[in-house]
C-alpha cells in the first residue's frame, strides 16, 4: 500500500475510535444506507460523514452519493443528491433540495422550499416562496430561474 492510502486508513480508524470516546458527540460516520451505518440515523455527526446514502443530522463535511439530513444540519455537502429539512451551509450536487435553506446550492437542479435566505447556482433553480418574477428585486428573483436565483430575508 502506498503512504497516502495508509494515512487515510489510519485517519478513518482514529476518527472511529475517537468518536466513541465523546458521549453524545460523534465526529465520524460511515454509511451504506440510513439503517446500515456506524451510528443510528438520529445521531448528530459533528465532523466527517462518508456515505453511499447517509441520513444523519450533522454539522460536518458530508461526502457521498446521497447525503440526506433530518432536522437541523449545517456544513458542506458534496454528493450526487443532497436533501435536507433545514440546512445552513453549502450543498454541491446534481440535485440539491432543502425545505429551509440558509446558504448556497451549486448543482444542475436546486430546490429551496422555505422562506429563508438562499443563493442558487445551476441549470434550474427553484424557490417556490418567491411568488412573482422580479417583483421584489433585489431581495428575490423568481419562483424558478436558470443559471442563478436567490431569496434574501427582509
PLM-predicted stretches and their roles:
Residues 1-9:
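Bacterial N-terminal signal peptides that target proteins for export
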Residues 12-15:
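Repetitive helical segments and hydrophobic/amphipathic motifs
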Residues 18-20:
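N-terminal signal peptide c-region/cleavage motif recognized by signal peptidases
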Residues 23-154:
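Surface-exposed, glycine- and small/polar-enriched segments that build interaction surfaces at terminal
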Amino acid at each position: 500500500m502506498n503512504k497516502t492510502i495508509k494515512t487515510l486508513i489510519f485517519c478513518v480508524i482514529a476518527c472511529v475510535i475517537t468518536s466513541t470516546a465523546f458521549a453524545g458527540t460523534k465526529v465520524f460516520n460511515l454509511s451504506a444506507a440510513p439503517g446500515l451505518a456506524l451510528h443510528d440515523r438520529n445521531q448528530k455527526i459533528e465532523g466527517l460523514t462518508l456515505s453511499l446514502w447517509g441520513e444523519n443530522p450533522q454539522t460536518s463535511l458530508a461526502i457521498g452519493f446521497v447525503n440526506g439530513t433530518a432536522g437541523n444540519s449545517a456544513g458542506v455537502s458534496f454528493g450526487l443528491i443532497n436533501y435536507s429539512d433545514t440546512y445552513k451551509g453549502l450543498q454541491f450536487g446534481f440535485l440539491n433540495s432543502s425545505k429551509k435553506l440558509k446558504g448556497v446550492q451549486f448543482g444542475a437542479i436546486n430546490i429551496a422550499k422555505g422562506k429563508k435566505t438562499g443563493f442558487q447556482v445551476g441549470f434550474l433553480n427553484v424557490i417556490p416562496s418567491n411568488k412573482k418574477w422580479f417583483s421584489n428585486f433585489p431581495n428575490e428573483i423568481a419562483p424558478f430561474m436558470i443559471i442563478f436565483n436567490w431569496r434574501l430575508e427582509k
